[in-house]
Amino acid sequence: MKKANVYINEIEAGTLSELDLGKKYRFEYKGNYRGNPVSLTMPVSQSVYEFNLFPPFFDGLLPEGYQLDGLLKFAKIDRNDLFSQLLAVGDDLVGNVTVKKIER
């Protein structure tokens, strides 16, 4: 299972987990987090969100076109491994969101 911490404005907001190798994902806010939501579709009032596909908000942060091709080649990531793609670019995302891999 892959996991990543998600930060908003450099404050840890929660954890994104891949539960079933590309088939199930979970985002969970930290219990004490009271900042801005990661996405308007995932308000802080609910602490756990589960998805059967890669969460749309995070999917929208991924590179496309030539940038995606370059990332896949450079990092040797499978085109369908969206979680690994997010981890590879997580320090340089558009906006105030940062994603960092949780090392086991």
Residue ranges and their predicted role:
Residues 1-104:
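Phosphate/dinucleotide-binding and metal-coordinating scaffold of catalytic cores
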